[in-house]
Curated annotation (Swiss-Prot):
This is Aspartate--tRNA ligase, chloroplastic/mitochondrial. It is an enzyme of class 6 (ligase). One of its GO terms (cellular component) is mitochondrion. One of its GO terms (molecular function) is DNA binding. Signal peptide: none annotated. It catalyses: tRNA(Asp) + L-aspartate + ATP = L-aspartyl-tRNA(Asp) + AMP + diphosphate. Keywords: Aminoacyl-tRNA synthetase, ATP-binding, Chloroplast, DNA-binding, Ligase, Magnesium, Metal-binding, Mitochondrion, Nucleotide-binding, Plastid, Protein biosynthesis. SUPFAM superfamilies: Class II aaRS and biotin synthetases, GAD domain-like, Nucleic acid-binding proteins. Residues 91-176 bind DNA. GO terms for biological process: tRNA aminoacylation for protein translation. ATP binds at R299, D300, E301, E562, G614, L615, D616, R617. Mg(2+) 3 binds at E562. It comes from Arabidopsis thaliana (Mouse-ear cress).
Length: 664
């Protein structure tokens, strides 16, 4: 019988006749003693004895107990932990029917619990009632199986299963809860067909989705990562875990806040925390030397594959710890996690790149260094060029950088470079075009005629040499403001690396990016804003020119993804007030929104710093998942909705009235 048919619910059944039917003529029936008024909680099951039904008994179809009867059963073993050491042992197992098949007059099912799967078989001659009930089961029924562990026949051994050398012969079976509706997808084959099952269906029926082996592995992996982190920080370094408030206050900078109206203080609002930043700084002022928290954070922002409106981060803060000690402690922690969880050995120490070097060489502050494709600045080649597009860009303060793609001349045709996927990738970054040149086998270059003709023979040789190009290579240009050029070439670099399979997936690229600028220019608002956050300390040597200062900030980047970021903090009030002033926060606004922080800095705040890791993102990368939604038990969709509970939702008008809220 097909797996699909096995998922269909049984039809409603009824009592048949008071006349006894022998087991030999009705192996699909079982017997319970006849009662006019069954006692509450009566166990509606059957005996494993092959004795025929006695006269006066009531014969019923093999259906579970009535809905009003709830049974709590115990088990002696777990399905995935049985082995040859258990042969001969009588066991009680509970779980879900993962597979059901009939072969040679015998019925087999795979019984699944959180530890794994074990095969259960029937012996119709010895235990006909158990055979009859199992024969009519459907996938995902919740059942109790009592039986004896036996070794599988040699021809039936399955070395791919952890329990593949044993099976359980069912002597007594009870259906604890049947499936009464058609399943939206098959759990058993869902891992193989994951790409065919729409994610909205998986999220809508998350309880089924989480039964899949891959999803279970992801959630267990997450648990193991958190358990290891807790053990390491507490036992090795003396950290203590402290919870910080969820109901906090809205602060400027960063993403939009989720607001919570106050009923008691009408017209006022709490904000859900985007991070525990200021609270953990308060803890350092309070004298708690080493703090950490597995913190829930909330940001009302546009979503991508690695973003959620509510997410979890590993949050840490330490007092009296210079930057070198801070980086070493975190390197040791991450090496421990990768080594114990995945067996990956990371370098000691981690490589470092300054922000300026990362942007110059890769066009990104989170570079993936598993492949080369470094960018080259060739502005000097075109300072006196006759190609006006380039010279005008330089005259307006822009730059010209190139990305040299080895053997890319044949990979990408001229038409692809003018209107294909690689061209579209450049357009997505905001570029107005994609200038390119190709190095021919004879060393000549071809491409945009006006660009080629702007270079004399010596200029061509110098240009090709400066690009590091060879015959057959493709040279892609980024022209314009520094930020725009880096954004375009970073995007093209990643596109080409994936498209040409240049990434060595056996390598693990982890590094620190340091020396970030303190501030960046916000063009729409025409003001400076903090690149990280306004509580980051500047480098001491840059204190005389704070608007241009570099920050004592550091980001940890793994395979091109930022997995953690932190900084040393400002711990003196006058410096903090100056930074807030630079980003446009007046003294009055600073006192209103950050008065408690400024007061604390005047009460003996120690030098301190910290870091936060995106736990969801870290587990996603350790587990090889494509989205953080696959490592969160109950995630939100890309439209910030919970498909399972259908939230957000409308609320009772009375609740809004109590909160003095009126909606449009």
């Amino acid at each position: 019988m097909s797996l699909l048919l096995r998922t269909l619910p049984l039809r409603p059944t009824r009592f048949l006749s008071a006349t006894a039917i022998s087991i030999s003529n009705a192996t699909n029936f079982f017997v319970v003693p006849k009662r006019t008024n069954p006692l509450p909680g009566t166990r509606r099951t059957f005996s494993s004895s092959p004795v025929a039904a006695a006269s006066g008994d009531v014969v019923v179809k093999p259906v579970p107990s009535p809905p009003s009867v709830l049974r709590w059963v115990s088990r002696t073993e777990l399905c995935g932990e049985l082995s040859v050491n258990d042969v001969g042992k009588r066991v009680h197992l509970c779980g879900w029917v993962a597979l059901h098949r009939v072969h040679g007059g015998l019925t087999f099912l795979n019984l699944r619990d959180h530890t794994g799967i074990v095969q259960v078989r029937t012996l119709p001659d010895e235990f006909p009632e158990a055979h009859g009930l199992i024969n009519d089961m459907r996938l995902e029924y919740v059942v109790l199986v009592e039986g004896t562990v036996r070794s599988r026949p040699n021809e039936s051994v399955n070395k791919k299963m952890k329990t593949g050398f044993v099976e359980v012969v069912a002597e007594h079976v009870e259906i604890l809860n049947p499936v009464r509706t058609k399943l939206p997808f098959l759990v058993t084959t869902a891992d193989e067909n994951k790409d065919l099952i729409k994610e909205e269906i998986r999220l809508r029926f998350r309880c089924l989705d989480l039964r899949r082996q891959q999803m279970k592995n992801n959630i267990v992996l997450r648990h193991n990562v958190v358990k290891l982190i807790r053990r390491y920080l507490e036992d090795r370094h003396g950290f203590i875990e402290i919870e910080t408030p969820i109901l906090s206050r809205s602060t400027p900078e960063g993403a939009r806040d989720y607001l919570v109206p106050s009923r008691i203080q009408s017209g006022t609002f709490y904000a859900l925390p985007q991070s525990p930043q200021l609270f953990k700084q308060m803890l350092m002022v309070s004298g708690f030397d080493k703090y950490y928290q597995i913190a829930r954070c909330f940001r009302d922002e546009d979503l991508r594959a690695d973003r959620q409106p509510e997410f979890t981060q590993l949050d840490m803060e330490m007092a009296f710890m210079p930057m070198e000690d801070m980086l070493k402690l975190n390197e040791d922690l991450i090496r421990k996690v990768f080594s114990e969880i995945k067996g990956i050995q990371l370098p000691d120490p981690f490589p470092r790149l300054t922000y300026a070097d990362a942007m110059d060489r890769y066009g990104s502050d989170r570079p993936d260094t598993r492949f080369d494709l470094e960018l080259k600045d060739v502005s000097n080649v075109f300072t006196e060029s006759s190609f006006r597009v380039f010279t005008e860009a330089l005259e307006s303060g822009g730059i010209i950088k190139v990305l040299c793609v080895p053997l890319g001349a044949k990979k990408y045709s001229n038409s692809a470079l003018k209107k294909g996927d690689i061209y579209n990738e450049a357009m997505k970054s905001g570029a107005k075009g994609l200038p390119f040149l190709k190095v021919l086998d004879n060393g000549e270059i071809e491409g945009i005629a006006a660009l080629v003709s702007s270079l004399d023979s010596a200029g061509k040789i110098n240009f090709v040499k400066q690009c590091g190009a060879a015959p057959g290579d493709l040279i892609l240009f980024g022209v314009g403001p520094v930020t725009s050029v880096n954004k375009t070439l970073d995007r093209l670099r990643l596109f080409v690396a994936h498209d040409m399979d240049l990434i060595d997936h056996s390598k693990h690229s982890i590094l620190w990016v340091t020396d970030f600028p303190m501030f960046e220019w916000n063009e729409p608002e025409q003001r400076l804003e903090a690149l990280h956050h306004p509580f980051t300390a500047p480098k001491p040597e840059d204190m005389d020119d704070l608007p241009s200062a570099r920050a004592l900030a550091y980001d940890m980047v793994y395979n091109g993804v930022e997995i953690g970021g932190g900084s040393l903090r400002i711990y003196k009030r006058d410096v903090q007030e100056k930074v807030l002033e630079i980003i446009g926060i007046s003294p009055e606004e600073a006192e209103s929104k950050f008065g408690y922080l400024l007061e604390a800095l005047d009460m003996g705040a120690p030098p301190h710093g910290g870091i936060a890791y995106g736990l969801d993102r870290m587990v996603m990368m350790l587990g090889g998942a494509s989205s953080i939604r696959d490592v969160i038990a109950f995630p939100k969709t890309t439209t910030a909705q919970c498909a399972l509970t259908r939230t957000p939702s409308e609320v009772d008008p009375k609740q809004l009235q109590d909160l003095s809220i009126r909606t449009k």
